[in-house]
Design a protein with these regions (language model features):
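Short, compositionally biased P/S/T/A/G/V-rich stretches that sit at domain boundaries
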Residues: 1-13
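Short, exposed coil/turn segments at beta-strand boundaries within extracellular/luminal domains
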Residues: 88-93
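Catalytic beta-strand/loop cores that center a nucleophilic Ser/Cys/Thr
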Residues: 139-142, 157-256, 273-290
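Short alpha-beta junction capping motif
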Residues: 108-157, 235-239, 244, 265
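Low-complexity, Pro/Ser/Thr- and charge-rich linker/hinge segments at domain boundaries
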Residues: 94-115
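Beta-strand-rich binding/interaction modules
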Residues: 15-53, 65-68, 78-86
Length: 290
């Protein structure tokens, strides 16, 4: 099962795999084989394990060994897990992510908005905290809106393909940044970023502030090598702003990754670690969006 299908652990979700299908192109069938499976955590420790019924594996493909059904109710926090399936010493692996079913994405002290409206401006001027999660298409073309963000990387070379989309090469971040504490990640893209990359624009960081260090960076095409961001933080007016060009609000009841990332960002903003170093003038922020 592809990694973008994320599991809901606290609701007693049963992990269902697609049928496990071996492919064997040798001169003879493999007799009386017992395929085995394991689910491991990020440290390589077994969380669950099992095996399939002994079977003969013929030459060719199309044989279904069976499916894996495992209750995940014992998992209480967001984690990255890996499914391993092995047959006679040969092994394949698939990453997947488990998130709690119920997370709080409301905080009375933080204004969460998709628009830089009067309410958001007043909140910042009064010294408050604002989480601005922009809808796709909100960033102005010249500020990054024209850049085709994609989960998959560039095909071949945009200089040879007339700038065929996508124009980006995934994300780059610090997995230990407190803003990502409840959104397990490597320093690079994995399947849990597919949703974000599919609902976002890039922010051209130099149009905001030269030298600003984003919480999550987007890697640009090597031909243009622009400094791009997906999540940034700054001081605006008297307040603190966490700005993401990912739409984390629209239909997020159907998007567990969006809901979990939103929760992680809110949790970060609630703590003392949220203290942006960059001061952003109002005119820069206002000119960023349509």
């Amino acid at each position: 099962q592809s990694g973008q299908h994320l599991a809901d652990g606290c609701a007693g979700f049963r992990f269902p795999s697609d049928p496990i299908t071996p492919v064997r192109f040798c001169d003879q069938r493999r007799k009386n084989t017992i395929p085995k499976w394991r689910i491991i955590d990020a440290n390589g420790k077994d969380v669950f394990h099992g095996q399939f019924t002994a079977t003969d594996i013929p030459v060719g493909n199309g044989l279904q060994l069976g499916t894996i059904k495992q209750t995940l109710a014992s998992i209480k926090k967001p984690v990255k897990l890996t499914l391993l399936v092995s047959v006679n010493g040969y092994q394949n692996s698939w990453d997947f992510f488990v998130y709690p079913s119920a997370v709080t994405t409301v905080n009375k002290d933080i204004l969460i908005t998709q628009e830089l409206n009067k309410e958001a401006i007043n909140k910042l001027n009064e010294g408050g905290k604002v989480l601005l999660t922009l809808k796709k298409g909100t960033i102005k073309q010249q500020n990054g809106g024209s850049i085709a963000v994609g989960f998959s990387s560039i095909f071949w070379n945009t200089a040879w393909t007339n700038k065929q989309p996508p124009h980006t090469l995934g994300v780059l971040c610090n997995p230990n940044h407190p803003a990502l504490k409840y959104f397990p990640t490597n320093y690079h893209s994995n399947w849990q970023w597919w949703d974000a990359m599919s609902h976002s624009n890039a922010i051209l960081l130099d149009s905001v502030s030269k030298g600003i260090k984003p919480v999550v960076r987007v890697i640009d095409d090597w031909v243009t090598a622009r400094s791009l961001g997906l999540v940034i933080e700054c001081k605006v007016g008297n307040g603190k702003l966490l700005l993401t060009s990912v739409d984390l609000i629209s239909e997020n009841e159907k998007r567990p990754e969006a809901k979990q990332l939103l929760y992680s960002l809110i949790n970060y903003m609630e703590g003392n670690s949220f203290n942006p170093a960059t001061v952003l003038p109002w005119e820069k922020l206002i000119s960023l969006v349509n």
